[in-house]
Amino acid sequence: SSPLSQPAQSILITTITNDKLIVRPENIGFFKYDSERKLWRVVLNSLQHFILKHQTTAETILNYAPEFIQIHKTYIININYLYLISENSCTLLPPFNKVSELKVSKMYKKKLLDRFYDM
C-alpha cells in the first residue's frame, strides 16, 4: 500500500521561538520561504502561521511527510490540498483557496504534475 493511505503521523515542528508544535500533515496547507529573513514559515488550515527555527531546510520539510512537495524554491505545498495547476502557479482547496501567491517553477513543475496525476 502507498504511504499516503496510512494514517498520517503527527509531526513535531520547532518554531523560531523554540516552541514545539505537534501538527498532523493534513492540517498544513503549505510552507513559504522568506528570502529576506532566510526562514521557512508554515501555514495551517486555521490560517495561522508560524516561523520555523533557523536550521529548518526544504529537505527537512520534505521529509516530514510524503504529501509535502516542493513547487518553487520558496514554496512547499501539501499535495492533498492541490486543486489546480495553471501555467506557473497553483491553487489550493479551501481554506487556502484565497492564496494566490503559490508560484510553480519550471524546475519543479514536471515532478508536481507527475505526482498530481498519480493521485
What residues fall within each predicted segment?
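C-terminal output/interaction extensions
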Residues: K111-M119
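Conserved binding/recognition cores within well-folded domains
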Residues: S2-N97
